[in-house]
């Protein structure tokens, strides 16, 4: 039962993370999980998924929107991550 719950939480967090929500929003959900090994594993997974921006190669203009939202700069896709240009 615990394995099924962990898998369900993992899939839910992956869905939320890939839908454009930022890591800070998903980490708020992680705090609802009791303190134990499962919580630390889930926090690590969410952090790693948040660092990889799946929308970068898939959606044209994703990095431009991402960088405008975060840093108010132009952005371009570099591998699987957005690269925000500095002024």
UniProtKB/Swiss-Prot annotation:
Domain BetaSPN-type CS-alpha/beta: 53-87
Pfam family, one: Scorpion_toxin_alpha-beta
UniProt superkingdom: Eukaryota
Primary localization: secreted
Entry's localization field: Secreted
Signal peptide annotation: 1-19
MF GO annotations: potassium channel regulator activity; toxin activity
InterPro entries: Long_scorpion_toxin_alpha/beta (IPR029237)
Alphabetical UniProt keywords: Disulfide bond, Ion channel impairing toxin, Neurotoxin, Potassium channel impairing toxin, Secreted, Signal, Toxin
Protein task: Inhibits voltage-gated potassium channel.
Protein name: Potassium channel toxin Tdi-beta-KTx
Organism in which the protein naturally occurs: Tityus discrepans
Lineage: Eukaryota, Metazoa, Ecdysozoa, Arthropoda, Chelicerata
């Amino acid at each position: 039962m615990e394995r099924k719950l962990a898998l369900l939480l993992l899939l839910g967090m992956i869905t939320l993370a890939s839908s454009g929500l930022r890591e800070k929003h998903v980490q708020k959900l992680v705090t609802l999980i009791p303190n134990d090994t499962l919580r630390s594993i889930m926090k690590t997974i969410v952090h790693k998924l948040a660092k990889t921006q799946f929308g970068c190669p898939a959606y044209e203009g994703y990095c431009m929107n991402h960088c405008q939202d975060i840093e108010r700069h132009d952005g371009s896709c570099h591998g699987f991550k957005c690269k925000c240009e500095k002024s």
